[in-house]
C-alpha cells in the first residue's frame, strides 16, 4: 500500500490484527552507558545501570499501551445529506472504519440533523463492535436518545444549537448542579461520562466534582498554535492532563487534531486514553483513501 504521507510503499498484511510485541531483545547502541531494547516495532533506551548494577527492562504493560482512535463520522453524513438518499451509507462506513483498525466510532447528533441524525445513532448501536461515543449538548431530546441507545460513552459538550462546530468547553464550576444531575442519570444506565473542557485544571477538577469518569480536552487552541511553537501550544494541555491524572479521571482529547500535530501531543501526554478525530481524518481520506488514512492516524498514536 502506498503511504502518501511518507511517500513510500508499505506492506500491510492484516489491518484487524493488533500489533504483536516481541520479547525485548538487546540491540546495539552508539551511546555509552545506555542500552536499547527492541520492543514491538520500536526501540526503548534504558539508562545506565543504577547502584544496584541492574538495568530496568520496560514494563510490558506500559510498552503495549496505545491511545485509542475514535473516528467521528459526522462529515460522512454531511456528504450523504447534501444529496439525499443514503450514499454514502454512514453505517457501512462506520463498520469499514472499525475493520480498518479504529477502536471506536464517535457521532455528534445536533437538533437540526445537519449531519448525523438520531435514527443513524440507533442504527449504529445495533451493529458496532467497538466503543460507541455519542457527544452533544445534553438537552432533553439528546439525553433521552442516549438513555435509549446506551452507548459505551457519552461526551457532554456545551455547544449552541446554531454553532458550526464545538467552540468551547464547559464551565464545570458554574454548571456543577446540572452536570452532576445529568451524569448521575447516565451512570444509572452504566454509561461512561466524559465532560468536554478547556485546558484549565480548575475545569478538570470541576468535572471530577460532577461525577465524570473522563474529561475531553478541547484541542482547537493547541492545533491553532502548534505551528508557531509546539511546546508553548502544549503547555496548558499538559497542566490540565496532569490534573486529570491527579483527580483519577480518564483523559480524552479532540478537535482539529491531525497528522501534523497528533504524535507530539500523545508523546508528551502518553496517558491520553482516546482521541476523537473526524474532520481532518475525512479530509485526508479524500487523498489517501479511508483505509490507509485510518492506519496513518493509528501509526501516529504508537
Where are these regions (language model features)?
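Alpha-helix-loop-beta-strand connector modules within alpha/beta enzyme cores
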Residues: 114-140, 175-194, 232-252, 297-300
Amino acid at each position: 500500500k502506498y503511504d502518501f504521507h511518507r511517500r513510500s510503499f508499505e506492506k500491510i498484511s492484516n489491518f484487524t490484527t493488533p500489533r504483536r510485541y516481541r520479547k525485548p531483545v538487546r540491540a546495539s547502541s552508539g551511546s555509552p552507558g545506555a542500552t536499547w531494547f527492541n520492543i514491538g516495532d520500536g526501540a526503548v533506551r534504558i539508562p545506565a545501570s543504577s547502584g544496584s548494577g541492574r538495568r530496568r527492562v520496560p514494563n510490558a504493560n506500559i510498552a503495549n499501551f496505545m491511545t485509542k482512535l475514535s473516528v467521528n463520522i459526522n462529515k460522512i453524513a454531511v456528504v450523504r445529506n447534501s444529496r439525499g438518499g443514503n450514499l454514502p451509507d454512514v453505517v457501512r462506513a462506520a463498520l469499514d472504519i472499525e475493520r480498518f483498525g479504529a477502536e471506536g466510532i464517535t457521532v455528534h447528533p445536533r437538533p437540526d440533523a445537519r449531519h448525523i441524525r438520531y435514527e443513524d445513532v440507533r442504527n449504529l448501536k445495533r451493529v458496532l463492535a467497538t466503543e460507541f461515543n455519542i457527544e452533544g449538548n445534553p438537552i432533553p431530546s439528546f439525553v433521552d436518545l442516549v438513555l435509549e441507545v446506551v452507548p459505551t460513552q457519552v461526551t457532554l459538550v456545551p455547544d449552541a444549537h446554531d454553532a458550526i462546530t464545538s467552540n468551547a468547553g464547559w464551565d464545570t464550576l458554574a454548571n456543577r448542579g446540572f452536570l452532576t444531575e445529568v451524569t448521575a442519570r447516565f451512570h444509572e444506565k452504566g454509561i461512561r461520562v466524559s465532560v468536554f473542557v478547556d485546558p484549565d485544571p480548575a475545569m478538570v477538577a470541576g468535572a471530577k466534582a460532577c461525577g465524570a469518569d473522563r474529561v475531553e480536552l478541547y484541542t482547537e487552541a493547541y492545533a491553532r498554535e502548534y505551528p508557531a511553537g509546539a511546546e508553548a501550544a502544549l503547555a496548558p494541555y499538559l497542566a490540565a492532563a496532569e490534573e486529570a491524572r491527579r483527580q483519577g479521571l480518564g483523559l480524552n482529547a479532540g478537535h482539529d487534531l491531525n497528522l501534523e500535530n497528533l504524535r507530539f501531543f500523545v508523546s508528551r501526554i502518553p496517558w491520553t486514553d482516546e482521541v476523537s478525530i473526524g474532520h481532518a481524518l475525512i479530509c485526508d481520506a479524500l487523498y489517501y483513501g479511508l483505509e490507509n488514512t485510518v492506519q496513518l492516524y493509528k501509526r501516529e498514536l504508537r
